Amino acid sequence: MFLSKRRIVLFGVIGALVITIIFLPRIQYFVNAPDVNVIDFNLAAVNISNISNNTNKIELSLLFDVYNPSDKSATTSKVEYDLFGDNKLLGRGVLSYEDIPLNGRPQFSPGQTATLKSAIILQPSDMNMDVIEKLISNSSDSINSIRWNVNGSSQIESAFVILEKDFSDVL
């Protein structure tokens, strides 16, 4: 007989395991998903790291403060952003932690602020040449006179869930 009591139990257990494996991410989503809308990305600082007068290339260092007011921990695998200076697109940046294990990525602990540092190299173009010239001419004073803003998105991860968070900030 093909369907003995043992085989029926075996097929039932295998079926339950398969259903659990398939639906586990959905269950975790509803149980452990943090509200990514409350996680706050702020552009904390823009500093000049290096100026190359020969090529007019400028390397900037950006600091993002990430505040997590929720009661669940989270982390990020990638932050993509567009940097604007005086409402002119200066460049696109990517801060990636995708090749780093979860325990080595920046942790957004409940009620805490984490700081992320990113470098971006500005390439001169007709659109942004006045901002680059302003930075080259007097780097210490001019960086404070420029209106910096950033628009971007981040992949927020918690347990088995990856959610997209859009952000925008002005400095």
Positions of the model-derived regions?
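Short, solvent-exposed loop/turn segments enriched in Ser/Thr/Gly
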Residues: 56-63
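Intrinsically disordered, low-complexity Pro/Gly/Ser/Thr-rich segments with frequent PxxP/GP/PP motifs
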Residues: 87-130
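Terminal connector regions
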Residues: 122-171
